[in-house]
């Protein structure tokens, strides 16, 4: 399971260092150059990564894109072509490249493609919008000293986990198919406390439907 080679890249992994000033998908994927009459991919390699993902061999494993320092530019701008795919109903939506040649106009994003992003929160970065936070899980890596008494058991994986197996456990579509309308009682009560407008409990935190489904899916797995 060699995910990357010596250069830090691989057929199933793409490392994209985000730059300041990206304003649209042309900075991330590329654009159709009408003067040259051809599509001009961005230097990120994202266009080639997506086109290579259409091969039969690439569909059998998970393919990862790492957005390094992702919020140096507004993520909603350069990822605008992908935001609609974060929901189940838009996962198969192709990207319009603007190419007038019909056979090359639409770029399909393989279902086994996933994004991982590293972000910072300081004066050099862009804040994350509520629209983005509602669609993705965010893990804070603040430095904390924790003393754990739990014993963890490690295990080894024999090769790459098939994509179909990962999709069955963690896929967005599976959450919709299983229908998570009924939350466990403890979780429902916790959400009620978050959304209680009692001043003594502090600021109100509204839990969106997407986040509720993500929590329910996590508990189910």
Q: Where would I find each of the regions flagged by the language model?
A:
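C-terminal regulatory/interaction module of P-loop NTP-utilizing enzymes
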Residues: 1-221
């Amino acid at each position: 399971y060699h995910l990357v080679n010596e250069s830090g890249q691989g057929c199933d992994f793409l490392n994209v260092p985000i730059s300041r000033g990206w304003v649209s998908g042309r900075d991330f994927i590329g654009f159709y150059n009408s003067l040259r009459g051809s599509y001009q991919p961005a230097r990120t390699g994202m266009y080639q990564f997506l086109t290579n993902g259409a091969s039969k061999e690439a569909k059998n494993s998970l393919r990862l894109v790492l957005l390094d320092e992702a919020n140096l530019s507004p993520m909603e701008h350069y990822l605008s072509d992908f935001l609609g795919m974060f929901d189940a109903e838009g996962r198969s939506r192709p990207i319009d490249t603007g190419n007038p040649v019909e056979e090359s106009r639409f770029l399909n994003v393989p279902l086994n493609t996933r994004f991982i992003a590293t972000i910072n929160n300081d004066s050099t970065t862009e804040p994350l919008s509520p629209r983005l936070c509602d669609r993705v899980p965010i893990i804070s890596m603040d430095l904390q000293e924790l003393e754990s008494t739990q014993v963890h058991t490690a295990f080894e994986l024999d090769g790459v986990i098939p994509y179909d197996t990962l999709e069955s456990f963690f896929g967005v579509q599976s959450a919709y198919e299983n229908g998570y309308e009924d939350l466990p009682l403890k979780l429902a009560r916790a959400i009620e406390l978050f959304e209680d407008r009692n001043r003594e409990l502090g600021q109100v935190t509204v839990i969106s439907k997407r986040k509720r489904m993500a929590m329910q899916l996590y508990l189910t797995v």
